[in-house]
């Protein structure tokens, strides 16, 4: 959290944010992600060209300039319109309309959950998965958008999951990656 007033409540804070550490406000710590051996098998047994994993939810409180949720939705719609057989979407709540990052968006989703609509807003949606690696091992590329952009050093498991599976990530997020 970049809210300095919250940091002052504690004796010490650990953060991934280099700027906070540079100003003596925290200690930079990068949490390790177990990478394992990795897989290099070529692509002959990978039938799916592109996949995207993510939940259909938007971040409230983040300026739209930083929030990549709407860009994720644009990318999904582009593939559905231009290369539908080459793209698969996995995650939660994509059977609902695109989530707005407002209270109104939460209200719309609550109605959609209660009233079964007869439309499929994201035809590429294949459902949720328990094991992301199984899907990545059958895919050549994965769309890897962080939830927000522009925060140096902020990365999540998304990009590591792709690398470990020998999958090529199409990345958008931290500018220093």
Where are these regions (language model features)?
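Nucleotide-sugar donor-binding catalytic core of glycosyltransferases
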Residues: 1-177
């Amino acid at each position: 959290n970049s809210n300095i007033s919250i940091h002052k409540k504690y004796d010490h804070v650990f953060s991934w944010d280099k700027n906070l550490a540079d100003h003596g406000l925290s200690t930079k710590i990068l949490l390790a992600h177990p990478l394992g051996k990795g897989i290099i098998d070529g692509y002959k047994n990978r039938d799916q060209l592109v996949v995207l994993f993510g939940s259909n939810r938007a971040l409230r409180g983040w300026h739209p300039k930083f929030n990549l949720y709407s860009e994720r939705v644009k990318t999904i719609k582009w593939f559905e319109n231009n290369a539908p057989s080459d793209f698969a979407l996995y995650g939660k709540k994509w059977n609902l309309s695109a989530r707005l990052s407002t209270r109104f968006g939460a209200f719309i989703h609550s109605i959609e959950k209660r009233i079964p609509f007869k439309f499929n807003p994201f035809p590429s949606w294949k459902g949720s998965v328990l094991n992301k690696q199984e899907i990545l091992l059958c895919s050549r590329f994965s769309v890897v958008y962080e939830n927000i952009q522009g925060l140096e050093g902020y990365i999540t498991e998304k990009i590591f999951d792709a690398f470990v599976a020998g999958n090529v990530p199409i990345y958008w997020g931290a500018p220093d990656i």
